[in-house]
């Protein structure tokens, strides 16, 4: 391509760039700027993200109230209702079903240990020991899986022993 055709292709783009660079900037930020920037500001509550205001379809209805983060935390802590069936995302799973299954159907000595650790998970959570509850939950899960694995190995060994016994018997 020659130099004149490149300039013809760039011509529609160049005036808008030069006009934007030469135009005086107003003090008020425009809504929907082509390249929005992200800024952070330090406040007494820590670092906060400052976002440019977004255009709204309900511009004539007034500014919506933004809830204060501290107010929502204090109102949540004052209520005794935990929201029904919703569980806290921090509550570790106790793996009680796996522990019961491993006691009843698999290798019961290890399953009993998994069952005890599953109960320790809930007791530690009730006392407020989040780390202890998480550790007990992980150990209960590992012992439950170990009990299932040992139970499967025991059942497989029993089937192999039974097959060997039946194969060695003389036919009637």
UniProtKB/Swiss-Prot annotation:
Name assigned to this protein = Transmembrane protein 91
Which segments cross the bilayer?
Answer: 98-118, 140-160
What are the BP-aspect GO terms? hematopoietic progenitor cell differentiation
What keywords does the record list, in alphabetical order?
A: Membrane, Transmembrane, Transmembrane helix
Pfam (any one) = CD225
Enumerate the residue ranges of region (Disordered): 60-86
**Cytoplasmic topological segments:** 119-139
* Principal location class: membrane
Which is a Gene Ontology cellular component entry for this protein?
membrane
Record flagged with keyword Translocase: no
- Which topology term describes how it sits in the membrane? Multi-pass membrane protein
Instruction: Quote the subcellular location field of this record.
Output: Membrane
- Name the encoding gene, please: Tmem91
Which ranges sit in the Extracellular compartment? 1-97, 161-172
According to the UniProt entry, which residue ranges have a biased composition of type Acidic residues? Answer: 65-83
Family statement? Belongs to the CD225/Dispanin family.
């Amino acid at each position: 391509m020659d130099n004149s055709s490149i300039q013809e292709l760039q011509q529609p783009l160049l005036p808008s760039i030069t006009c934007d660079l030469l135009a005086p900037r107003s003090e008020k930020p425009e809504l929907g700027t082509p390249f929005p920037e992200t800024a952070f500001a330090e406040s007494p509550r820590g670092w906060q993200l400052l976002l440019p205001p977004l255009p709204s379809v309900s511009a004539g209805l007034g500014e919506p109230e933004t809830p204060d983060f501290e107010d929502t935390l204090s109102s949540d802590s004052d209520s005794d209702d935990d929201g029904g069936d919703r569980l806290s995302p921090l509550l570790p799973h106790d793996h009680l079903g796996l522990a019961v299954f491993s006691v009843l159907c698999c290798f019961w000595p290890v399953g009993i240990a998994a069952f005890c650790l599953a109960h320790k998970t809930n007791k530690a959570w009730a006392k407020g020991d989040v780390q202890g509850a998480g550790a007990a939950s992980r150990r209960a899960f590992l012992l439950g899986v170990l009990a299932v694995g040992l139970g499967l190995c025991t059942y497989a060994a029993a089937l192999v022993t039974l097959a060997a016994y039946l194969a060695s018997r003389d036919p009637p």
